[in-house]
């Protein structure tokens, strides 16, 4: 059992900034952003500076406002349900495991024409402070976060009831809609108009001891948003690490395991649990005999250059794009240790 004092709702921004916290993708203060109900998870109110991560709830039949960020990039990961996003001039379907990337200056919108609610986890880099004004969490007159309002909002936040988390839709490999898939576009095309990604498709990487894919990163065409996806097999522990300049929001998307978080240490974790690890905060994960395996994935901004410097993907400030590939079941389970 995790001490409640380690959870993000009970820690100040300063405590999280220096030592991290345990969160969950369905637990955070609720605001309205672009007409949609939104849970704020990692943001300046939790000590994050380079990125904000929210969960956006899109009810059946609902459509967002159309909006543009001239400064920030945004990526949406579909965790459950199905939506359509306005991407590269057309409505594109987003299903569990798919990510939609929007560069700065690109208009976008979301609609749900299905019969059920959808849950999207979105990363905004850098954070858009104006999204927090109407909820009283950011004071535009003085240009600062309202710490007392944030404290009360976090303490009184009602976790979103989505039923058993292990019964949410599975995030799987998809390569439909090829015209907008990142692997079929050049990095320059992705950087200009955005693209559709998938969590199981990207550049192969094993630098922290796990089979994983670099999904959103500069070699694929993104600049500020970053996302990696990994399998943590039974009996496996990754290399404990920090990121010098990247805040990370590390999610256990499915399965069971343990997370290591800053000054908290090892804590049990399950589907939807998150290690909030701002830059410099030690973090990692492992699967034990009675807790594992799991699928892990982290949003980080800027993309973690420290991971790729030792590889052939980076040299003297320039990224080399390898051929994207699928992270397969056989590759995942080949790493199991017990």
Regions found by a protein language model. Give the residues of each.
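A short, N-terminal "cap"/entry segment at the start of jelly-roll beta-barrel domains
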Residues: 1-50, 135-224, 239, 311-338
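Non-catalytic C-terminal interaction regions
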Residues: 4, 268, 274-279, 285, ...
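Conserved short histidine dyad/triad with adjacent acidic residue
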Residues: 35-42, 54-70, 209-214, 228-243, ...
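Conserved hydrophobic/aromatic beta-strand scaffold that supports enzyme active sites
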Residues: 38-40, 53-57, 75, 91, ...
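Short, charged/polar surface micro-motifs in flexible loops or helix N-caps
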Residues: 46-49, 59-62, 82, 222-223, ...
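Ligand-binding loop in jelly-roll beta-barrel domains
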Residues: 49, 84, 96-98, 104-131, ...
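Residue-level recognition of conserved beta-strand positions in structured domain cores
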Residues: 55, 68, 80, 87-89, ...
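A short beta-strand-loop-beta hairpin characteristic of the jelly-roll/cupin
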Residues: 62-96, 106, 237, 243-271, ...
């Amino acid at each position: 059992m995790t001490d409640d004092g380690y959870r993000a709702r009970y820690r100040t921004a300063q405590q999280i900034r220096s030592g991290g916290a345990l969160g969950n993708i369905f637990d955070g203060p609720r605001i309205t952003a672009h007409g949609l109900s939104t849970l704020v998870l990692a943001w300046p109110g939790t000590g994050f500076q380079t990125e904000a991560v929210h969960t956006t709830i899109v009810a059946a039949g609902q459509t967002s406002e159309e909006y543009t960020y001239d400064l920030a990039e945004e990526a949406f990961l579909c965790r459950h349900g199905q939506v359509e996003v306005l991407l590269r001039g057309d409505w594109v379907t987003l299903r569990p495991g798919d990510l939609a990337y929007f560069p700065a200056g690109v208009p976008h919108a979301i609609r749900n024409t299905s019969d059920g609610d959808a849950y999207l986890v979105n990363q905004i880099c850098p954070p858009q402070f104006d999204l927090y004004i109407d909820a009283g969490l950011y004071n535009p007159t003085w240009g600062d976060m309202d710490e007392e309002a944030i404290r009360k909002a976090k303490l009184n936040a009602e976790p979103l009831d989505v039923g058993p988390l292990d019964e949410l839709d599975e995030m799987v490999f998809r390569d439909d809609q090829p015209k907008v898939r990142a692997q079929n576009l050049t990095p320059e095309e992705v950087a200009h108009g955005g693209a559709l990604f998938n969590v199981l498709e990207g550049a192969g990487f094993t630098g922290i001891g796990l089979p994983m894919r670099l999904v959103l990163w500069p070699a694929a065409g993104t600049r500020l948003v970053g996302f990696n996806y990994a399998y943590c097999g039974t009996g496996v522990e990754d290399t404990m690490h920090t990121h010098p300049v990247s805040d990370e929001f590390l999610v256990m998307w499915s399965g069971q395991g343990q997370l290591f978080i800053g000054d908290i240490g090892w804590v049990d974790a399950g589907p939807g649990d998150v290690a909030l690890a701002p830059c410099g905060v030690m973090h990692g994960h492992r699967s034990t005999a009675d807790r594992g395996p799991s699928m892990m994935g982290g949003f980080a901004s800027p993309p973690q250059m420290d991971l790729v410097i030792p590889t052939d993907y980076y040299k003297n400030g320039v990224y080399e794009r390898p051929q994207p590939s699928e992270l397969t079941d056989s590759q995942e389970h080949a790493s199991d240790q017990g």
